Amino acid sequence: MRVNLLIAMIIFALIWPATALRAAVSKTTWADAPAREFVFVENNSDDNFFVTPGGALDPRLTGANRWTGLKYNGSGTIYQQSLGYIDNGYNTGLYTNWKFDMWLENSPVSSPLTGLRCINWYAGCNMTTSLILPQTTDASGFYGATVTSGGAKWMHGMLSDAFYQYLQQMPVGSSFTMTINACQTSVNYDASSGARCKDQASGNWYVRNVTHTKAANLRLINTHSLAEVFINSDGVPTLGEGNADCRTQTIGSRSGLSCKMVNYTLQTNGLSNTSIHIFPAIANSSLASAVGAYDMQFSLNGSSWKPVSNTAYYYTFNEMKSADSIYVFFSSNFFKQMVNLGISDINTKDLFNFRFQNTTSPESGWYEFSTSNTLIIKPRDFSISIISDEYTQTPSREGYVASGESALDFGYIVTTSGKTAADEVLIKVTGPAQVIGGRSYCVFSSDDGKAKVPFPATLSFITRNGATKTYDAGCDDSWRDMTDALWLTTPWTDISGEVGQMDKTTVKFSIPMDNAISLRTVDDNGWFGEVSASGEIHVQATWRNIN
């Protein structure tokens, strides 16, 4: 026993010096970073998220989880140029062709990072994603991202959707602390086989604790509210159907229309911030050039207004704390320039958006969001519209298939406007459909697509004779004539003296829930569970022999 022990001790003594001399990465543990505050934007209008500094930028927790209309695509002004990311506060540069790992200890969420963030238009970055993919990811981070040549790259990790969802549910005023590990090496290891930067013979490994506090939560509310606006050749607006909180208004010497366009809630921990700016921007460059700054104005209370002029006028975060809405004023000249440019029959979500700029974070501080409400702007001469009688963009229904169950009914208002009544008005329903036994049916599907269930559908309206006319309309994309509907006529006179009329009627789209054919799938199998479908209703009008 004593001999064996001696041999073991000798072997240990021989091996130990070799182990002690082995090369390794250089590990640096930085002092804890100062705690930082962030503002979280929950965008229910566009279904995405945005996080931005409430104070100092570093350590970074900044950017959106989705591209917006401000994404830079290689030309024009550079606004949004990367998706959201984090770093340890030192903004450390990376070496070309080296490998990079980033992982979190005490991560607030599983799978927090997707890869190496880069600026999308820099050489070596992906213009579409602003992401350099790693060889692998796990519950803590990503590994084996090769630093491409070209533009600068830094130790930045792109945030996953799971990270944003964690930030969303955090109460305002709460904090989290995580340890960020960032490691780069020139060794060409295979991360997909389990190798890691920290285990290589050379490189630099940085460790730092960072703390972030949720200082505010801005929730942009999609009200789904809808309103029609008809404009004449001089730009004078006339409100049609809808509930988007609009009214005619005069501001100074300009008359026009003002509407509540954004609804929001803003919770804070008392944060004071003036670097966050919010303002509207016209999406059509020709229209933006044609109108004056005061032809479009915006307000937090509907009485005190600021002109729209790129980034020159804005409301700050601090100003937004005392309100819950943003109003927009459109002058008659604004609408007149739309007419002159041939911009008509347009949705305001395609006409302008709101921009969010945090001047503290120039690379990731740009964001864009849609309005909460929608205006459908149409010419008063020769136009047709259809909107839900609930004044919502996306009406929906749900029900059960069984004997005696009520149909899913959708009501709509159809409006025509012209110098005379339309000579012909047509309507059709489009959506998933299948012909069974010579009849077209709307097809509802399960989430996995395995169950496809046929449903009959009808369009009906009251005729001028007081009778109800019903069409079989199984989502078949075929036009039906509704010219003989009972129209309510309202005359109008243009500022030029020309006369015309606005005609309105109602139509109902129904999907019976008690038809026996819906008890089985299109393959004649029984089914159980939930199925759904979406479709559209279209209208068109024709005027003939108009001088």
Curated annotation (Swiss-Prot):
Subcellular location: Fimbrium
Signal peptide as annotated in the record: 1-20
Regions annotated as coiled coil: none
Main function: Part of the ecpRABCDE operon, which encodes the E.coli common pilus (ECP). ECP is found in both commensal and pathogenic strains and plays a dual role in early-stage biofilm development and host cell recognition. Tip pilus adhesin, which is required for assembly of EcpA into fibers.
Inducers of expression: Negatively regulated by H-NS. Positively regulated by IHF and EcpR.
Stated family: Belongs to the EcpD/MatE family.
GO terms for cellular component: pilus
Record protein name field: Fimbria adhesin EcpD
Subunit structure: Forms polymers. Interacts with EcpA.
Disulphide connectivity of cysteines: none
The keyword tRNA-binding is assigned to this record: no
Domain of life: Bacteria
Keywords for the protein's UniProt record, in alphabetical order: Fimbrium, Signal
